Amino acid sequence: HVRHIVGDDLFMKYSLTPARPGLTAAKIQWVKENQPQIYEKVEHILLPKDYLRYRLTGEYATEVSDASATQILDIPNRKWSDEIMTAMNLNEAMLGKVYESQEITGYVLPEVAKLMGITSKCAVVGGASDNSAGGVGTGVVAPGRAMTTIGTSGTVFAFSEEPVLDINKSVYTFCMPVPGAWHFMGSVNSCGASLKWWRNNFYPDDLEYEQINKDA
């Protein structure tokens, strides 16, 4: 339904991908239509790590890499899309301020600092989504660099200097947790389970995954 409300033209222009059922915008719309008694009580919408940020700092905020997967972010300009928010009847106060990943978003509240045994001068930065944090950690921070990860999902992740739209609609273009940079990402959500199924059905139980990789 979110496709009919927002339209793929707006999604493609700002989120650089058509409406996707697994991303946040579609989930918000589902709750609005199927659980209106819950949605009418909603004051803020936060991603998991951003809820932890709120508990630590009292700040409603997010950062560009994780916010890219909401389909509400204007990815080329690294800010919330006014057009998508208007179409969905959302506003920035509900979603929180958008930061770059390295920016300080707040400081640990005194009562939280006391509970944790740390100083209340401890800064909490924007952070990053799981795959983009992995990209930074493995050095995918320059043109020509890419990585592949296999866990629950299997992901191919590559650096980009520009917010390029994939005309085939097969990969995401999201903000990197590096200012002025983006990344391409393709993902198969069942990759880990598929690899385990292949190993269990076609190889001896004691065979290491390294041998499967060599065979592949």
Where are the regions a protein language model picked out?
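Active-site core segments that coordinate phosphate-bearing ligands/cofactors
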Residues: 3-61, 66, 71-82, 86-89, ...
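A conserved helix-loop-beta module that forms one wall/lid of the active-site cleft
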Residues: 89-100
